[in-house]
């Protein structure tokens, strides 16, 4: 029960962070000045970006993360070629979203990992602590799909801390 309450609070905080800047249906971020910037450009990438997350650090830096789905499918599913890999990529902005850094992979899935949990990382959410410079990135991981997960073969929650 405690885990469900904690997860609900965590998701609500994540959604509030996204709503503070505003993401439209095309994955664009629009700020209060009215300009729109494409953060992760799906039009020029053969690999789909999905599930965006955004937060602002104590110093005003925007952190935007999303899935980079090399498998072209969700965590726990493989494509026709047997590829499972999904990475989480991130960009930063120090000018409230007018310009963005190059894309950096912050969680790299590994098709050949000895531990199947490290095969894919996806569905990111980010929390930035307002009193420190700590950032927490949460995601799901592994080869188990949400729909088929069991206690013996779960879909894992992963946390990265900076």
Could you describe each region identified by the protein language model?
Residues 1-9:
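Bacterial N-terminal signal peptides that target proteins for export
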Residues 10-19:
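Hydrophobic h-region of N-terminal signal peptides that target proteins for export
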């Amino acid at each position: 029960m405690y885990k469900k309450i904690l997860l609900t609070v965590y998701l609500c905080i994540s959604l509030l962070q996204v709503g503070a800047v505003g993401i439209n249906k095309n994955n664009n971020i629009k700020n209060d000045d009215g300009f729109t910037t494409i953060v992760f450009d799906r039009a020029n990438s053969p690999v789909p970006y999905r599930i965006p997350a955004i937060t602002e650090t104590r110093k005003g830096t925007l952190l935007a993360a999303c899935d980079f789905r090399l498998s072209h499918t969700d965590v726990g599913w493989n494509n026709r070629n047997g590829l499972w890999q999904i990475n989480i990529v991130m960009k930063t902005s120090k000018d409230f979203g007018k310009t963005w850094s190059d894309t950096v992979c912050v969680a790299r899935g590994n098709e050949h990992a000895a531990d199947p949990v490290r095969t894919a990382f996806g569905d990111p959410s980010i929390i930035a602590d307002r009193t420190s410079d700590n950032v927490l990135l949460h995601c799901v991981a592994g080869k188990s799909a949400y729909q088929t997960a069991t206690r013996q073969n779960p879909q894992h929650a992963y946390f990265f801390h900076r």
